[in-house]
């Protein structure tokens, strides 16, 4: 499976082309729109989420509610584009119109300045438009398709926030993936402990009032994963490494860990490794899951537990100092539309990119032209593992 996305934040639309989805997968626009709606939710989101009620158009690769095995084309229209017709015009326009929304005061923490230098732009909007988190709309759409495949082969995925603006959320022990999914969906701040809900909302309100932003840590959990996805044979075939790349590719994500993650550096080996046992009913199991479902770059049958840390959104309503790229004089950074936090939305994006990596790996191991053959191959393999 591979894909490309295209489109600018305030352009006419966002597009994705996906190749490698097996034929026979039940799929409708509704399946994708549900996740697009989740991405636009969450406490603290700004006015654009009220403007853009994202709806996908599937224009190829699906017929009568099932995939055809051919490339799938997805499009989401940017409703806000009608206010940007001159600024985002494909054709050349008058110089005075170009200057109306020209960006020359780069925002610290964004791609503005470095993108302008790299691509020789005198209007930093050219970098802003593509580097915007608006692009993640399409990655969520792609992830929605990936999750449909995972569900068909018995793999489920969920996300929740474990640190919100420096406030650590106490998570109840031994929650299932389904329980996490339900509890997180019932929370406006995507947490599984309701006792923290109001405290987090009040904190977001205070941060917004101060013109500032906050980040946090998102945890994604995947259950039902077969043993042996990924490989130790080469560095670039390790599945945890592929997931790590996908997670830190999300806008504003600056770190990733699995299981105990960085806490492992403070413990002894006997406190970290997961003891192995075997039962007739369950086969090989681990007595703990400190390694987050991975050993040697391969899935070991335990739930995948991966966390990503998101920095605070760089666009501040009380902007930091920057420089005018024309005069090189000190200047306050440009202010674009922003939110005090986008953590709940980031969790939806993280869930999507992890699902996409997993489906790509599944299709590599169980290469199949159609869903029937894929499900049979996975079933046969699971049976083999059970009797090893």
Swiss-Prot record:
* Binding-site list for NADP(+): 39, 45
The record's remark on the cofactor is:
Reduced FMN (FMNH(2)).
- Disulfide bridge map: none
Which biological process terms from the Gene Ontology are attached to this UniProt entry? amino acid biosynthetic process; aromatic amino acid family biosynthetic process; chorismate biosynthetic process
Reported cofactor(s): FMNH2
* Record field: catalytic activity: 5-O-(1-carboxyvinyl)-3-phosphoshikimate = chorismate + phosphate
Q: Which UniProt keywords apply?
A: Amino-acid biosynthesis, Aromatic amino acid biosynthesis, FAD, Flavoprotein, FMN, Lyase, NADP
Keyword Flavoprotein assigned to the entry: answer is: yes
Q: Name one GO cellular component term.
A: cytosol
Metabolic or biological pathway, per its Swiss-Prot or TrEMBL entry: Metabolic intermediate biosynthesis; chorismate biosynthesis; chorismate from D-erythrose 4-phosphate and phosphoenolpyruvate: step 7/7
As recorded in UniProt, its EC number(s) are: 4.2.3.5
Q: Is NADP a UniProt keyword of this protein?
A: yes
UniProt xrefs under Gene3D superfamilies: Chorismate synthase AroC (3.60.150.10)
**Listed GO MF terms:** chorismate synthase activity; FMN binding
Residues reported to bind FMN: 130-132, 251-252, 296, 311-315, 337
Subunit relationships: Homotetramer.
What functional role does this protein have?
This reaction introduces a second double bond into the aromatic ring system.
Q: Which family is this sequence assigned to?
A: Belongs to the chorismate synthase family.
Q: What is this protein called?
A: Chorismate synthase
Identify the species of origin: Streptococcus agalactiae serotype V (strain ATCC BAA-611 / 2603 V/R)
